[in-house]
Amino acid sequence: MKKTVIELFAGVGGFRVGLNDIHGFDNNGKAIENRDWKFVWANQWEPATTVQHAYDCYVTRFGNECSNEDISKVDSKDIPNHTLLCGGFPCQDYSVARSLSKEKGIEGKKGVLFWDITRILKDKKTPFFLLENVDRLLKSPSKQRGRDFGIMLRTLSDLGYNVEWRIINAADYGAAQRRRRIFIFGWKKTTKYNENIDYIGPKYLIAQEGVFARAFPIEQEDSKYRCIDLLQYEDTVDITKHFKAEFENSGIMINGKVWTRKVTPIYEEPITIGEIRENRKSLDKYILTGEKLKKFEYLRGGKKILRTRPDGTEYYYSEGSMSEYDSLDLPGRTMLTSEGSVNRSTHIIPDKETGKLRLLTPIEAERLQSFPDDWTNTGMPEKRRYFMMGNALVTKVINRLEPVLREIIENQ
């Protein structure tokens, strides 16, 4: 089977950077792709901004095969056939209800991007998919933990897919950032790969032979499996109303039945902030001085603030102190879209030349996500470069999954 890919919610191309082992670009700004995954289509659209910086970056690096329109308005007929669908999508409300119009059946809320993913999977009969989301997806919503993921899994099962997932902290496997994300791999029950799955069995897949166990080895310990039968529910509306179960950080769904267990990674030495720190001189614009430095000292310090609830009662909001700056001997913390702004979560490091405290540079932010240097230096403001990296994934995770995905698809 050909290795053809579409990338949804593409951002600045993280899945493509990882799958095609991209480390830089040529004099024209075009990415130098070192593997042969053929990206036949991509979509990137930011509804909140007039200037489409992420799309512009994607086109600069890869060319014009990227769509820049609301994915919900894209007709599936206009999307090329493909073997692998990939994309990182936000954690939203996945609850469903019966529509007032019986012809429409069960409907999810408008604007929830997962339903666009499932529409495309259904219409294009995509053999394989790889998705990324925040780790809290497994426990959402807070008042009915696990419900949203249960709805997603049952929906995918009804579409003819089996699914494997794992929460991966990139730093546990040698990356430069402590970033926990859930990765979800799915395959059609009609694929040759599914025939092999039947012989192996779900527990062995989670422990040793699955996509994630092969790429990201785990300790072979005797943790208990939890079994969840999603077919006991009439449909996803029933799951929305009555779901009660907990998902662990690893699991697999086969024919609507789930096996899930907590797994422990076999830890690898991570890349440290000290290793990704820029060596070049004259980074004065990033050095903290005066009021800005005082503001960070306050934000990172411990505090106890008297606040008032809506009902008028008072309480103290407490916040523990952080170290003055981020250790150069550790990987970075989870980078947010607010990186580089005056914010408690922003990284602060000592400058190599002067020893003074400073912000990360956009290049260092790119290195935390395993992107090539200056990947986002395509004309967007620096503030947006940080934003793009805060929204991106650690491409090293995808790069590491690539050999396993390649073997599966080439053997189809």
Stretches found by the model and what they are:
Residues 5, 179-181, 330-332:
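Extracellular structured ligand-interaction cores
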Residues 1-125, 134-149, 157:
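Core alpha/beta nucleotide-donor-binding catalytic domains of modification enzymes
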Residues 253-412:
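C-terminal target-recognition/interaction regions appended to catalytic cores
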Residues 7-10, 83-84, 170, 336, ...:
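Short glycine- and Lys/Arg-enriched binding-loop motifs that mark or flank ligand-binding interfaces
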